[in-house]
């Protein structure tokens, strides 16, 4: 059964461009080989980690959104687990599409001088 998934991968922050392109190619190849449908692959950049992982305080985040079955998730996570450059990964099944949350706008308060003038 084909379902929607998203995966966040944290890799070492000091990887070169060739290694990053190799990681991108690896993920897209796994999804294509397992007959999945890749929707989005985003590089979120280097960010500070909440706690050190393998003596690293920073990590480069990647967001992957795709359609596939359980075998695809199992293979993707197995291959990520074996890669030394990957610090952490987390895959989540998307139950239903949610619209982007609307931006919260703070209510405008009337100035005390404007109230006194009325």
From Swiss-Prot:
GO terms under cellular component: cytosolic small ribosomal subunit
Positions with biased composition (Low complexity): 99-118
GO molecular function: small ribosomal subunit rRNA binding; structural constituent of ribosome
HAMAP family: Ribosomal_bS6
Keywords: Ribonucleoprotein, Ribosomal protein, RNA-binding, rRNA-binding
Family according to the record: Belongs to the bacterial ribosomal protein bS6 family.
Region (Disordered), start-end ranges: 98-118
Matching Pfam families: Ribosomal_S6
GO biological process: translation
Protein's name according to its UniProt entry: Small ribosomal subunit protein bS6
The protein's role, per its UniProt record: Binds together with bS18 to 16S ribosomal RNA.
SUPFAM superfamilies, per the entry: Ribosomal protein S6
Lineage: Bacteria, Pseudomonadati, Thermodesulfobacteriota, Desulfuromonadia, Geobacterales
InterPro entries attached to this UniProt entry: Ribosomal_bS6 (IPR000529), Ribosomal_bS6_sf (IPR035980), Ribosomal_S6_plastid/chlpt (IPR020814), Transl_elong_EF1B/ribsomal_bS6 (IPR014717)
CDD domains reported for this sequence: bS6
């Amino acid at each position: 059964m084909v379902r929607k998934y998203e995966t966040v991968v944290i890799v070492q922050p000091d990887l070169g461009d060739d290694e990053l392109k190799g990681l991108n190619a690896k993920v897209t190849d796994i999804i294509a080989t397992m007959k999945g449908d890749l929707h989005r692959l985003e590089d979120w950049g280097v960010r500070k980690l909440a706690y050190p992982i393998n003596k690293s305080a920073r990590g480069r985040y990647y967001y992957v959104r795709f359609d596939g079955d359980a075998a695809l998730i199992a293979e993707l996570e197995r291959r990520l687990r074996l890669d030394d450059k990957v610090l952490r990964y987390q895959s989540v099944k998307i139950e239903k599409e949610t619209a982007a949350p609307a931006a919260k706008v703070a209510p405008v308060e009337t100035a005390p001088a404007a109230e006194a003038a009325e």
